Amino acid sequence: MTSVAELREQVRSLQDELAQLKGERGKTTTREKITKMSSEVVDSNPYSRLMALQRMGIVKEYEQIRQKSVAVVGVGGVGSVTADMLTRCGVGKLILFDYDKVELANMNRLFFTPDQAGLSKVEAAAKTLNYINPDVKIFTNNYNITTVESFEKFMNAIRTGGIDGSGAVDLVLSCVDNFEARMAINAACNELSLNWFESGVSENAVSGHIQFIQPGEKACFACAPPLVVAENIDEKTLKREGVCAASLPTTMGIVAGMLVQNTLKYLLKFGTVSDYLGYNALIDFFPKMGLKPNPTCDDRFCVLRQQEFAAKPKEETFEEVQQEEESPVHAENLYGIELVSETEVESAPTVPVATANTGLKLAFETPIQMEHSSAATDVIKNDDVSLDDLMAQMKAI
């Protein structure tokens, strides 16, 4: 048997090894915080390629993203990648919610690393995200939002989670993997009238979707319940011991990309935000559709928001407003590029390249294009020869 002294020595050795690893981690260079985004194109500027969107006319003012606060509920296969992308994009504030721990079984997905096994997902994610971009304010919440006590904490967190702590978050992103948590987010956002995105990946890992929900304007998650609720099935009975859902990092990465792309469009007001966008990996199919709210929805706050929306004066939609002609992004035409019609015949240059005073000469002469006449008399010669004479000539050949 191992003696107490040997066990103490092993513990001391492990403590020394842990201290050494922490010291090496601390020596890793971390950049200083940046107070203002710059478009300067230098290797040391982490925002130069993001600010290029503004220079190219895609976004009016990209730095507005630093004034946005986003809540990410669920830091798993989709949520962790979503938080990673938003951090790299420079969002002002991220609020993470999850109560699970990192496991080695999660290593088939993106973001987490084996050395983080055993840590809470929100704490492990916060450390990595702070290292990626120290400019982002990251707050963690390690609890299950579906319990009565934690639901109130969740409501308060998103109600006061604005960039300055006085208002609500700008957007809530649902990246959870169960119906109960989705319904909790739906109830909270309907009550607080907060816009949010729902996302998910199928159990066979070859399809996924995102859904944009505006309380009162678009269908909430309770307006069109999935099969497990429509047939009154207890979701917990669907899980069997020793059986787990499939998981592909590719599908989760694609769904996270769709989610963050539409999040950026919503926050920075460019492009068109998709109401519902699906993904089928088997045939690379991306279906889109609009979802209207259900007037008889079981969520009373959803019905209340519908009534409030119906009472608002109707505004012209983006499609109905005639867009003013925008000035070209690049007014200068340095290279003399011109658009030519496909049916237009190019005219020959007035000055041959070989005779132009440019020091150039033709490598070969362009053949003169033959002009084709459409008249049948130019192709067939009419000699007034009878058919019998032609037959005789053919036999004689």
From Swiss-Prot:
Keyword Zinc among UniProt keywords: yes
InterPro entries: D-isomer_DH_CS1, ThiF/MoeB/HesA, ThiF_NAD_FAD-bd, Ubiquitin-activating_enz
Alphabetized GO MF terms: ATP binding; metal ion binding; UFM1 activating enzyme activity
Catalytic site positions: C244 (glycyl thioester intermediate)
Keywords, comma-separated and alphabetical: ATP-binding, Metal-binding, Nucleotide-binding, Ubl conjugation pathway, Zinc
GO BP terms in the entry: protein ufmylation
GO cellular component, one term: cytosol
Pfam families, alphabetized: ThiF (PF00899)
Membrane-traversing stretches: none
Amino acids binding ATP: G77, D98, K121, N144, N178
Coiled-coil residue windows: none
Keyword Zinc set for record: yes
Residues involved in Zn(2+) binding: C220, C223, C297, C302
PANTHER family, A to Z: UBIQUITIN-ACTIVATING ENZYME E1, UBIQUITIN-LIKE MODIFIER-ACTIVATING ENZYME 5
Family: Belongs to the ubiquitin-activating E1 family. UBA5 subfamily.
Stated role: E1-like enzyme which activates UFM1.
Name listed for the protein in its UniProt record: Ubiquitin-like modifier-activating enzyme 5
Organism: Culex quinquefasciatus (Southern house mosquito)
